[in-house]
Design a protein with these regions (language model features):
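Acyl-donor (CoA/ACP) binding surface of acyl/acetyltransferases
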Residues: 1-34, 64-177
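Conserved GNAT-fold acetyl-CoA-binding loop/helix
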Residues: 30-52, 63-65
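Short loop/turn motifs at secondary-structure junctions and domain boundaries
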Residues: 56-60
């Protein structure tokens, strides 16, 4: 089972007990306005998300980690890698993404978890490039992407939801935390 420890976090595969706390995160409009179509997700939809993330782990050898706070064991959210299917500018490439419950914002958890995920991409999966997209209006994600050393590579439009996106990439052959 893949686990990564950082000074404050445990990144791990999903457990049955994660469904309720992740559903609470997915029910928060402030969190979900930055994800996909911006709509909140039900517990059933969240269960489908976890199932899809676990399938990606089985098929690709990477996926979304559960982000757990060391000490308290509280689920803070999700971070990980996936093969992007859209927008066309990054389709087929490995993308990093995250979502954290609102109570965990502004504490550096997203940056800490994302750094550990990029290290995993290089050291455990041998990836040489990772991409990301963010909504143009999402300044908090822009800050995290900057801290990761990811470079803005242009813009795109979400083909399903119509949002304007900023596209980022990083050459992991020279990645250093």
């Amino acid at each position: 089972m893949t686990e990564i420890r950082t000074p404050r976090l445990l990144l791990r595969r999903w457990l049955e007990d994660d469904l309720v706390p992740l559903s609470e995160i997915h029910a928060d409009p402030a969190v979900m306005r930055r994800v996909g179509d911006g709509a909140t997700r039900s517990e059933d939809q969240t269960a489908q998300d976890i199932e899809a993330w676990e399938e990606e782990w089985d098929e690709e050898g990477f996926g979304m980690f559960a982000v757990e706070l060391l000490g308290s064991g509280e689920l803070a959210g999700a971070v990980g890698l996936s093969v992007a299917d859209a927008p066309a500018e990054i389709a087929g490439q490995v993308a990093i993404s995250w979502r954290l419950g609102r109570v965990f914002w502004g504490q550096g958890y997203a940056s800490e978890a994302a750094h550990a995920t990029l290290e995993f991409a290089v050291q455990d999966r041998g990836l040489d490039r990772v991409v990301a997209v963010r909504r143009i209006t999402d300044a908090a994600s822009a800050n995290v992407l900057d801290k990761l050393g990811m470079q803005a590579e242009g813009t795109a439009q979400d083909p399903v939801h119509g949002h304007d996106l900023a596209v980022y990439g990083i050459d992991l052959t020279q990645y250093q935390d």
